[in-house]
Curated annotation (Swiss-Prot):
Descriptive protein name: GTPase Der
NCBIfam families the record matches: GTPase_EngA (TIGR03594), small_GTP (TIGR00231)
Family statement: Belongs to the TRAFAC class TrmE-Era-EngA-EngB-Septin-like GTPase superfamily. EngA (Der) GTPase family.
GO molecular function: ATP hydrolysis activity; GTP binding; ribosome binding
Native source organism of the sequence: Clostridium botulinum (strain Kyoto / Type A2)
HAMAP family, sorted: GTPase_Der
Keyword flag Plastid: no
Single GO BP term: ribosome biogenesis
Domain of life: Bacteria
Assembly: Associates with the 50S ribosomal subunit.
Organism phylogeny: Bacteria, Bacillati, Bacillota, Clostridia, Eubacteriales
Amino acid sequence: MGKPIVAIVGRPNVGKSTLFNKLAGKRIAIVQDTPGVTRDRIYAEAEWLNYKFTMIDTGGIEPKSEDIIVSQMRRQAQIAIEMANVIIFLVDGKEGLAPADEEVAQMLRKSKKPVVLVVNKIDKLKDENNAYEFYNLGIGDPVTISSSQALGLGDMLDRVVEYFKDDESDGEDDERINIAFIGKPNVGKSSLINKLLGEERLIVSDIPGTTRDSIDSYVDTEFGEFTLIDTAGLRRKSKVKEEIERYSVIRTYASIERADVCILMIDATEGISEQDQKIIGYAHDINKAILVIVNKWDLVEKDDKTMDKFKKELKVNLSFMPYAKYLFISAKTGQRVVKVLQTAKECYDNYTKRVKTGVLNDVISQAIMMKEPPIVGTKRLKIYYVTQIGTKPPTFIFFVNDPACIHFSYQRYLENQLRENFDFQGTGIKLEFRERKEK
């Protein structure tokens, strides 16, 4: 089911993220010289010889380290190995064989998964002799590459796809709905995703900011197939000191751009912040479907009016997106968690909704009869025809006598009429006006 999964594993700093980014063709994993900088799995789609597959970049495995983050990275890598169809075991040809390599090899042998041993950092022909000592790992013939110079990658990928050539290379997967979970650090994004997935998929610990990068997880449910993107929490600029944090802020915005639905998570005990408004404002500006989730609702003292009051306050602070859907949950206790993906799917359905042209024009004709367009200057707006030209978000073109005659208040009226007649809750809609000469 689905595309084959290829996991890139190995001890820290052997070049996994550099290789991953070369294969993905874009800078997906955070790459820095600090050991352990790729702290969680990151996914990307790849293709070679018409075979489509999913790659996983794992945090480096340090088998005997007691450091809390490293030990959690090791567990994450083990989960990636279990999920993978083929494993690329990356070692460092410059440093040579290390004890940690032997321990990783032992872990891979136990998995009984197909493994392609890849010796990285072989930048020159004369360095190829460095690969021989890795035969001692008992993993098979090594492939030599230089990920930084993109040398030998074709040979490596030939070996990888060899393992799933028997599988049918089907063309299209069912479309997955991309959902980005955004919000301040420690608002409960990773905890909610883990609850939805039913596995310890994301690093969750007491150390602030343990989701440094944006992480993808896949889940299939009765409501559809989803990609869940957990983003690093956005801090105020004064707190963003390390380079690593700057990368993560950029990645959060990039995650919003590739999402279909953005879920803003708010801490019920803290309420909405200026930072929350800023980040969801960006999602609104680039026309994403939006669901606002108030987490930690179990910690709030409440009566039967508390939720309505809280929602009313949120709507005031988020008045620029009156269409947003709201959900009050507790990721910790599981309260209403079952509704998260269902509600996100409703937002997505509205985000991709198409309205028949005949029905659309009937609604707009009725709206014009109820409220005639105002005169702007010396001309009155005439609407001849309207049609939907796209989705994500639903986009409508009105053919009119003069686009300059459209007053913002009348445009808002037309949008409200569309919303009243068709359910667009959870998504923005776009109205465009084009001139058409009257015949």
